Amino acid sequence: MEAQQHGDQLKRGLKNRHIQLIALGGAIGTGLFLGSASVIQSAGPGIILGYAIAGFIAFLIMRQLGEMVVEEPVAGSFSLFAYKYWGSFAGFASGWNYWVLYVLVAMADLTAVGKYIQFWYPEIPTWVSAAAFFVIINAINLTNVKVFGEMEFWFAIIKVIAVVAMIIFGGWLLFSGNGGPQATVRNLWEQGGFLPHGMTGLVMMMAIIMFSFGGLELVGITAAEADNPEQSIPKATNQVIYRILIFYVGSLAVLLSLLPWTRVTADTSPFVLIFHELGDTFVANALNIVVLTAALSVYNSCVYCNSRMLFGLAQQGNAPKALLNVDKRGVPVNTIIVSAIVTALCVLINYMAPESAFGLLMALVVSALVINWAMISLAHIKFRRAKQQQGVTTRFPALLYPLGNWVCLLFMAGVLVIMLLTPGMAISVYLIPVWIAILGVGYLVKQKNGKTVKAH
């Protein structure tokens, strides 16, 4: 299917409030609401420290991306920076890897949607729910970017209000005594200690924790459609650290005080489970609505992100020119449709392997995310060196350059080692060389066909 040709320019339809809430929405997603369950089982209350460490690394990456985006706000975000400052293969590989990453994230979140629906209707297979919301969200994204922005704005508002309310309500239950005798801050250290399985238990969970932060860099993708990226991008980036502290560290500290961590199960959102265990059915149902909203929010962002990344690849000559078609509303219809067709594989995966689908997709996401973040840090090093040679002082410099970049790269290497030692996740690491080889073949085919373009 091909959209009517109306040019190849995206409209700058995202306001500052959209950018801020898109950044916030990226920080509150399935990783926190569902992925944290398995981490709690292995790391206990130490999960709080794990999220703080991974959050700091995510913030460093965000500042590196933010510095580049403020200087050059373009569609395709960092793949263009890799292309321009590192080389054509780096741009080709990072762009396609990012697209595949968000296709996988989209699949994982659609799977999570199915799990949340089963809280109310256990008899409905996950693939049915995934298929229904797949159609709805893609239809919405085919309207215009303002509709996406408004939808994500309100999704994020719901998530923020809910998490803050949960922290306040949970704190009240904790300190008023209304949470029952098991609700006490001593749960953070009395059930086998803060790190019941030692640092090993925490370290082995860092890969899954990292999954939670896989939406933060979406801010960089919004730059091409932001009214004033020079102001909105730095503001959104700097606020990430506070959001991580409040929404991850704060919410988990309250939750793990309300109920011993040993009562958490891996296949249910700990947020919903804890209030359900406390006998508060109303709050449990309300929170399930929130975690469902969170998954839909991230999937909504994925649809947006995938289409814009493909658009950026097409602009660079790294994807078919037909993907540059933009309709009269400024929507890249072809890229949305192509991304949707690939994401539809999620429905098939959930049909064939409903029990293991989420775990498999999460492992694949983390591997792609490691490549993604590593390439952001490496591209940023090249970017900064180029600017220094040009005598240019950037407006939004990254923190701790270049030490921060190397710390991030060391962290990524550590995550890969952890995944190799984790049953069920090692396969995704073994697939990395295969994936790079596929990218290499694709690049050679593109070069042979003479479709190279000059970076601009």
Protein language model regions, located:
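Helix-loop-helix junctions that connect adjacent transmembrane segments
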Residues: 5-10, 48, 121-125, 157-285, ...
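TM-loop-TM module centered on a large, flexible mid-protein loop between adjacent transmembrane helices
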Residues: 80-82, 87, 119, 205, ...
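Membrane-interface "cap" regions at the ends of multi-pass membrane proteins
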Residues: 1-36, 41-46, 58-63, 72-75, ...
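Membrane-helix boundary/coupling elements in multi-pass transport proteins
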Residues: 74, 97-112, 213-226, 281-321, ...
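Extracellular loop-to-transmembrane helix junctions
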Residues: 11, 34-129, 133, 240-249, ...
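Membrane-interface loop-to-helix entry segments
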Residues: 114, 127-183, 213-214, 237-241, ...
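C-terminal membrane-solvent junction of multi-pass transporters and transport-like membrane proteins
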Residues: 154, 322-331, 370-423, 452-456
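Helix-loop-helix connectors at the membrane interface of multi-pass transporters/channels
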Residues: 1-7, 80-83, 109-130, 162, ...
